[in-house]
């Protein structure tokens, strides 16, 4: 698969990328599965309701069992009552995780990268470094490359690059092992350094 190789001025040459990573068919069902699993595994239990044993209430019977004409009632903590406990409350310990086999996950990442390459959303650079940790420098460099919303995958995250890009809302910098399916899909472009492509091939090939 031929990808664009950009220089510092944004001029493009051709880079021959490995078909094992960028030449696969798009498997929509698999990509959907790994994205959903990734989002589910990132979830933390932060909802909670009380059941009928946990709500504050009296155990006194609201009215006598027979003779009032009203429906019988045992206590005000019943889920039928306003202010009563939930019948099936959510718990912070709820487990949302989904298991995805490593082989499937790697195949899904390859499928995403291949589709992005076909859509001309992947570009390659030799390296991505900055002289100092200035956001202005990072923004200017990305502008010269013709990039605004971009995921930068580099073999080694330079401290200057990390500090300079962390305040840019549509830019993320990661190493190949941290390139997750959601980020790959989310950003308009993916910029990969040559050494990072070698690492991706070793990880996913």
From Swiss-Prot:
Residues 43-95 are annotated as: Disordered. Gene3D superfamilies: 3.40.1370.10. It holds the Pfam family Ribosomal_L4. Residues 58-69 have a biased composition (Basic residues). Keywords: Ribonucleoprotein, Ribosomal protein, RNA-binding, rRNA-binding. GO terms for biological process: translation. Transmembrane segments: none annotated. GO terms for cellular component: ribonucleoprotein complex; ribosome. Residues 48-57 have a biased composition (Basic and acidic residues). GO terms for molecular function: rRNA binding; structural constituent of ribosome. Belongs to the universal ribosomal protein uL4 family. PANTHER family: 50S RIBOSOMAL PROTEIN L4, LARGE RIBOSOMAL SUBUNIT PROTEIN UL4M. Part of the 50S ribosomal subunit. HAMAP family: Ribosomal_uL4_B. One of the primary rRNA binding proteins, this protein initially binds near the 5'-end of the 23S rRNA. It is important during the early stages of 50S assembly. It makes multiple contacts with different domains of the 23S rRNA in the assembled 50S subunit and ribosome. NCBIfam families: rplD_bact. This is Large ribosomal subunit protein uL4. It comes from Bordetella pertussis (strain Tohama I / ATCC BAA-589 / NCTC 13251). The lineage of its organism: Bacteria, Pseudomonadati, Pseudomonadota, Betaproteobacteria, Burkholderiales.
